[in-house]
């Protein structure tokens, strides 16, 4: 009887830590796959570019993109830690003209060659103004599974969910020089809500022209008053 009781106690001593690990693991998985509601700012719905992923902007660099933009571009690289929300969102409204999955290596997500060597998916989007954007889901050393639901020909809206990269990864966004960039290196961003830039529109062009015309007129008025 004593032996049986000892075995029962011993089983519970083992079962306690195992149960704790199981509950902790389940809690982490539920936390990792959380998908909070996000609403883009009202002034970003038409011509804004929002962050396609949660994380930190680790680099903003100039480069040439022969794949889709076919010219000079500025690349915004966002690193996602395992604690960030990993649901990805479309950066701007428009039509998906390019969608391709590329198998590859699993370098750490912040490696300079990760965007060229790692497993990734690439999406080219044309905004209604004609401006083109390219964004890439890039797997890291831990994240080895990319999921997305975008196809060529899809019409998408700013901030719409489109996929996930699991357990630490990176997102690259390439924009042409004409885009007014707001992103800063080191900035912490949230997918679907943080505005990274703005696409030039005919309205913004007319506004700039009007301001440029008004400035000389004001100067002329001051000179006339002085004389």
From Swiss-Prot:
Keyword Ion transport: no
Active-site feature positions: 169 (schiff-base intermediate with substrate)
Cofactor: pyruvate
Region Disordered: start-end pairs: 197-227
Entry keywords, A to Z: Cell membrane, Decarboxylase, Lipid biosynthesis, Lipid metabolism, Lyase, Membrane, Phospholipid biosynthesis, Phospholipid metabolism, Pyruvate, Zymogen
Pathway(s) the chain acts in: Phospholipid metabolism; phosphatidylethanolamine biosynthesis; phosphatidylethanolamine from CDP-diacylglycerol: step 2/2
Pfam families: PS_Dcarbxylase
Localization, UniProt: Cell membrane
MF GO annotations: phosphatidylserine decarboxylase activity
PTM sites of type Pyruvic acid (Ser): 169
Catalytic activity annotation: a 1,2-diacyl-sn-glycero-3-phospho-L-serine + H(+) = a 1,2-diacyl-sn-glycero-3-phosphoethanolamine + CO2
EC number(s) stated in the UniProt entry for this protein: 4.1.1.65
Family designation: Belongs to the phosphatidylserine decarboxylase family. PSD-A subfamily.
PANTHER family: ARCHAETIDYLSERINE DECARBOXYLASE PROENZYME-RELATED
Name this protein carries in UniProt: Phosphatidylserine decarboxylase proenzyme
Organism: Salinibacter ruber (strain DSM 13855 / M31)
Gene that encodes it: psd
């Amino acid at each position: 009887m004593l032996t049986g009781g000892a075995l029962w106690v011993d089983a519970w001593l083992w079962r306690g830590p195992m149960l704790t690990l199981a509950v902790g693991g389940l809690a982490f998985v539920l936390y990792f796959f959380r998908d909070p509601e996000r609403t883009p700012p009202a002034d970003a719905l038409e011509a804004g570019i929002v962050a396609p992923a949660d994380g930190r902007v680790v680099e903003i660099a100039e480069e040439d993109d022969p794949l889709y933009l076919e010219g000079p571009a500025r690349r915004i690289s966002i690193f996602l830690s395992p604690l960030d929300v990993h649901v990805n969102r479309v950066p701007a409204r428009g039509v998906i003209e390019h969608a391709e999955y590329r198998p590859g290596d699993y370098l750490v997500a912040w490696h300079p060659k990760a965007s060229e060597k790692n497993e990734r998916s690439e999406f080219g989007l044309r905004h209604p103004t004609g401006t083109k954007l390219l964004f890439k889901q890039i797997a890291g050393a831990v994240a080895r599974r990319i999921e997305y639901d975008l196809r060529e020909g899809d019409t998408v809206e700013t901030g719409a969910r489109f996929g996930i990269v699991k357990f630490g990864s990176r997102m690259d966004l390439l924009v042409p020089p004409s885009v007014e960039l707001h992103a800063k290196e080191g900035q912490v961003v949230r997918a679907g809500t943080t505005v990274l830039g703005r696409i030039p529109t005919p309205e913004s062009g007319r506004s700039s022209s009007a301001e440029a015309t008004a400035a000389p007129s004001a100067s002329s008025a001051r000179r006339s008053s002085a004389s």
